[in-house]
Amino acid sequence: MPFNPGKKLYISDVTLRDGSHAIRHQYSIQNVKDIARALDKARVDSIEVAHGDGLQGSSFNYGFGAHTDLEWIEAVAGEISHAQIATLLLPGIGTIHDLDNAYKAGARIVRVATHCTEADVSRQHIERARELGMDTVGFLMMSHMTTPENLAVEAKKMESYGATTIYVVDSGGALSMDDVRARFRALKAVLDPSTTTGMHAHHNLSLGVANSIVAVEEGCDRIDASLAGMGAGAGNAPLEVFIAAADRMGWDHGTDLYTLMDAADDIVRPLQDRPVRVDRETLALGYAGVYSSFLRHSEVAANKYGIKTVDILVELGKRRMVGGQEDMIVDVALDLLNKA
């Protein structure tokens, strides 16, 4: 589908899910309410709510959340009147039972997330979401780790299971603008014209906003972003920055920029115990193509064993570790320690 500058962009906020990684999943109920209220006032289309690793992500491996997914979802449901609540489910971490409970708590959109070459495992969850009448999204993580053509094959699988939107997910913040363009062209070549597409960018190479703009130019319908870029690694595409850029380009986004700017600086940024920015460590994520949520885990391991976080991240990239392999971070740290 060619670029249509007149279409309304769907703005999908991820501050209350991906943003959870930035503070080790420690949002309080009051934090969640304050952020949701501001986002709803700004009239974003959806607000994603869950542990950073999705429904039931709270665990020893991924980090325990301050509250349950359902407590967070219910808190948001009580604060919003415009936006819909989205949630994230990674098959193997979350189950159909968890999806049912999230729906009862107020979630009406689910993004079923798999590694970019493993769409097969999403079938049951996508089918159940459609049975519930949810807006059902296929979410292909670490999209830089396969070719555009292979990504399109996986996207087609998710579409065949019932997903009505397919996302290119740059979990490592490693895609260039040409990479994004190639992936959307490959998806558009095989997906049904009625199937919408989305872009989930990370800012590890400072390309989060640029990649989101390129995606829209290639016909992308939905853009993920977060207040102050709150997210794993160097964060997601900063929502207020993307909206300002979209506004200058004359695109219809339907949100209030100044409300988003205030929320980013007054509510979200003060919560960051580690600045969400491009620095030595987060740049290494994008450069090495590493899953962005490995950052905080790697920093803990580096501090414990007296080695550099960057060295751990680069080695994880060499080993092509993917989301869900957080347990390997300590193994890598110990290997590096033994080689020192």
From Swiss-Prot:
SUPFAM superfamilies: Aldolase (SSF51569), post-HMGL domain-like (SSF89000). It catalyses: (S)-4-hydroxy-2-oxopentanoate = acetaldehyde + pyruvate. This is 4-hydroxy-2-oxovalerate aldolase. NCBIfam families: 4OH_2_O_val_ald, PRK08195.1. It is an enzyme of class 4 (lyase). Its EC number is 4.1.3.39. It comes from Cupriavidus pinatubonensis (strain JMP 134 / LMG 1197) (Cupriavidus necator (strain JMP 134)). HAMAP family: HOA (MF_01656). The lineage of its organism: Bacteria, Pseudomonadati, Pseudomonadota, Betaproteobacteria, Burkholderiales. It comes from the Bacteria. The active site is at residue 21. Pfam families: DmpG_comm (PF07836), HMGL-like (PF00682). InterPro entries: 2-IPM_HCS-like (IPR050073), 4OH_2_O-val_aldolase (IPR017629), Aldolase_TIM (IPR013785), DmpG_comm (IPR012425), DRE_TIM_HOA (IPR035685), PYR_CT (IPR000891). Keywords: Aromatic hydrocarbons catabolism, Lyase, Manganese, Metal-binding. Mn(2+) binds at residues 18, 200, 202. One of its GO terms (biological process) is catabolic process. GO terms for molecular function: 2-isopropylmalate synthase activity; 4-hydroxy-2-oxovalerate aldolase activity; manganese ion binding. PANTHER family: 2-ISOPROPYLMALATE SYNTHASE 1, CHLOROPLASTIC-RELATED (PTHR10277:SF9), HOMOCITRATE SYNTHASE-RELATED (PTHR10277). Belongs to the 4-hydroxy-2-oxovalerate aldolase family. Transmembrane segments: none annotated. Residues 9-261 form the Pyruvate carboxyltransferase domain. The record marks 17 as: Transition state stabilizer. Substrate binds at residues 17-18, 171, 200, 291.
